[in-house]
Amino acid sequence: MFSLDFSPLWPYWPTFLLGAWLTLKMTCVAVFFGLIVGMLVAFAKRARVPVLTRLCIIYIEAVRNTPFLVQIFLLYFGLASIGLRMPTFAAAALAMTINIGAYAAEIIRAGLESVPRGQIEAAECLGLPKWRIGWHVMLQPSIEKVYPALTSQFLLMMQASAIASQISAEELTAVANTVQSDTFRSLETYIVVAGLYLVLSLIIKLIAWQVGEHLFKRRRAIRLAAKRAGKAPPDPQRIDTVIPGGAA
């Protein structure tokens, strides 16, 4: 009769933790650069330059409508066939960055379009520089509105990093495949790996929450004020953002 036995896995705990660390590191690198790419593409798509807009549309549609596995294979095997070889970590992180960039661009673009035109015009009337209008009046409020969607996308990409095992990147799933082939304890191995992915997801959620608390102090102030008043906190997305310089 079958029974769970995790004892053969104990010697492999350092290997599991190393795979989890590589998965987390790969995700953090991809999220950082992917968010930058997403912001640039979102602004470029809104620019009144037809060629630039078309290029952004091609990039977004190509990434969003092709499998992530194929994208990794194109970068790792496709480029290698023309002499451009990359380490497995670099290829996986680059594919994840490109993927996150496309999805983040559309999420951020939706946030930018939700900023009232009158708010931007008011900032222009105050004589604010364009970079301040772009950052304080447009980007910050839009990021605050779409932050939960971005966080969910980052979590999905962390979980999709398991596909990197197909190019022998030594992340968590690749480690699991090696361990289960050594121990022949497939069920126990993948239970452990599922638990580690759950822990990684909770860590990323905690990091995202802390970052959100730091970046969006207005939301925190609204929540604390509502708590002191004994009322349910209002939706910060429905409250007009204060424009730097004193105008609302």
Where are these regions (language model features)?
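Transmembrane alpha-helices and adjacent helix-loop boundaries
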Residues: M1-A248
